[in-house]
Amino acid sequence: MGKENAVSRPFTRSLASALRASEVTSTTQNQQRVNTKRPALEDTRATGPNKRKKRAVLGEITNVNSNTAILEAKNSKQIKKGRGHGLASTSQLATSVTSEVTDLQSRTDAKVEVASNTAGNLSVSKGTDNTADNCIEIWNSRLPPRPLGRSASTAEKSAVIGSSTVPDIPKFVDIDSDDKDPLLCCLYAPEIHYNLRVSELKRRPLPDFMERIQKDVTQSMRGILVDWLVEVSEEYTLASDTLYLTVYLIDWFLHGNYVQRQQLQLLGITCMLIASKYEEISAPRIEEFCFITDNTYTRDQVLEMENQVLKHFSFQIYTPTPKTFLRRFLRAAQASRLSPSLEVEFLASYLTELTLIDYHFLKFLPSVVAASAVFLAKWTMDQSNHPWNPTLEHYTTYKASDLKASVHALQDLQLNTKGCPLSAIRMKYRQEKYKSVAVLTSPKLLDTLF
């Protein structure tokens, strides 16, 4: 109604001027309204980047350069402070690690030195294992130097090659150069056999335990037991390693325990049972061992004896035997041959097995027995060449002069100069499958060989 009345009024000059004034005023107010809203919009846009700063992770991923500059600008003082502390802690850590490595290396070298310098004058306390870690070194032979195997560093090898003593070392055939057969472990063979040489010095029975400990069991009884066990191993087609380990277990148990003669055969079948479980894929049952004794012993007696033997050994069964070293020494002996000689292998195995019966061979280390068997086997088969060569000397670490006593004792066994009636091993190696090497004899050993 107001607007209609205003329009219907007469249009005069005063009314026209009033209308123009009102339009100017409204336009000014509208512009002021627009100007008052624009700063608010600008403030909103200005605060937009501040809200994006909350998404710090995305900012670091999408704009690495800018964020790096910002971080360097803000944290320069903290970085300088932290850097000093970090260097101090790193140097302390390096010093501690170096000291620990040095201590460990010194302890290891000390253990090896003790093992290599231990002599054979050891005392035995009956029924104890205090001498289990002691070694017998009748031969006063030194421990072989730690080998620089194929895994050794280039610096170590170059140092050895560059030494002045290298030209004086005779050449030998590398028997570990064949990497095709994984069973030979050519990459680790030098280190493995070095550890075996260290292990043979430990847990060795003293060569006079029969006289010192056993009053009811004699050397001849021990020989009869071993001869019978050879027949048992042939009956059940057991591996030769089982037989060697059996004899070792018997000697080590007799070394620390008094045994009556009625229990000697029980000890023998129990040790063969334990060795079979360790070496064989399928070991004979306890009932079978009871059967071969004509049921002289029951199953419970065998189990009780097994418990005693394992407790005496602290369940540490394995030890390197002459058979362990014989395999490697035979490879070294036939390294220069185009085709290996089976006669030499069978004859060396035969001679080594003969030592199991003779109690007096306990004074020789297993590696010495194996090396002597190879020496005598080569001399028996061929007298035109010297049985020892640089390759054998390198891999056995024994010179021919070191083996003189053991080779002569082994030849007496081969020729049976003492007239030993035990013939199980001789009958075994007279078979055609062993090339009848038991019938072979060796000529007299010359002093020039040693």
Curated annotation (Swiss-Prot):
Keyword ATP-binding on this protein?
A: no
In the induction comment, the record states: Repressed by MYB88 and MYB124 in newly formed guard cells.
UniProt subunit comment: Interacts with CDKA-1. Interacts with SAMBA.
Q: Where is this region: Disordered?
A: 18-53, 75-94
According to the UniProt entry, which residue ranges have a biased composition of type Polar residues? 23-34
Localization of this protein? Nucleus
Any Pfam family matching the protein: Cyclin_C
Q: Which GO terms describe its biological process?
A: cell cycle G2/M phase transition; cell division; DNA endoreduplication; guard mother cell differentiation; lateral root formation; mitotic cell cycle phase transition; positive regulation of stomatal complex development; regulation of G2/M transition of mitotic cell cycle
Q: Which GO terms describe its molecular function?
A: cyclin-dependent protein serine/threonine kinase regulator activity
Official protein name in the record: Cyclin-A2-3
* UniProt GO cellular component terms: nucleus
Stored SMART domains: CYCLIN, Cyclin_C
Quote the function comment for this protein: Negatively regulates endocycles and acts as a regulator of ploidy levels in endoreduplication. Promotes divisions in the guard cells (GCs) after the guard mother cells (GMC) symmetric division.
Q: Which family does it belong to?
A: Belongs to the cyclin family. Cyclin AB subfamily.
Q: Which domain of life is it from?
A: Eukaryota
* Alphabetical keyword list: Cell cycle, Cell division, Cyclin, Nucleus
